[in-house]
Regions:
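Alpha-helical membrane-inserting segments
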Residues: 12, 44, 48, 52, ...
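Membrane-interface helix termini and inter-helical loops of multi-pass transporters
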Residues: 13-29, 138-143
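Hydrophobic alpha-helical transmembrane segments of multi-pass integral membrane proteins
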Residues: 31-68, 72, 76, 80, ...
Length: 143
């Protein structure tokens, strides 16, 4: 699956699909500024990670994150970090990360057990990341 996503990520970059998606996202929320766009980028990453593998989401969204930054004329690092942190925040389903799948089966949990604890944690990390990422990785790097 990851190999297929690598090919898809490369194809998105080569064909301009990443630019098209980035332009759509920045057109929708870019007028609110880079902080809101970063927050939405993180949110997209964490939601997609709950549905497919976190590695696949990282491969798919990283080229889009770079295009978003380029479209907005800001440093790409905060957007790349938002994608990586969002992909790592897979707590609301047993699908997004291998460890969740292991404990799902071995622990005898139900699917509905994951969102009860994981969704509030995802929301908390979304808020914290949206605040702290621009502090540690500014949109305009210091000279």
């Amino acid at each position: 699956m990851i190999l297929g996503m690598l090919a898809l990520g490369t194809a998105m970059e080569t064909t301009g699909a990443a630019h098209l998606i980035a332009s759509g996202l920045t057109g929708a929320v870019g007028h609110f500024g880079p902080a809101v766009t970063l927050s939405v980028t993180y949110l997209v990453a964490t939601v997609l990670t709950e549905l497919i593998s976190n590695n696949a989401v990282a491969v798919l969204l990283t080229p889009i994150a770079f295009e978003i930054a380029a479209t907005m004329g800001v440093d790409a690092r905060p957007f790349a970090v938002a994608v990586m942190f969002g992909c790592a925040a897979s707590f609301a389903t047993p699908i997004g990360h291998q460890t969740n799948t292991y404990v799902f089966g071995a622990g005898g949990y139900r699917f509905s057990d994951f969102p009860k604890i994981g969704a509030p944690l995802n929301i908390l990390l979304w808020i914290v990341a949206s605040i702290l990422i621009p502090i540690f990785w500014p949109f305009v790097p210091k000279p």
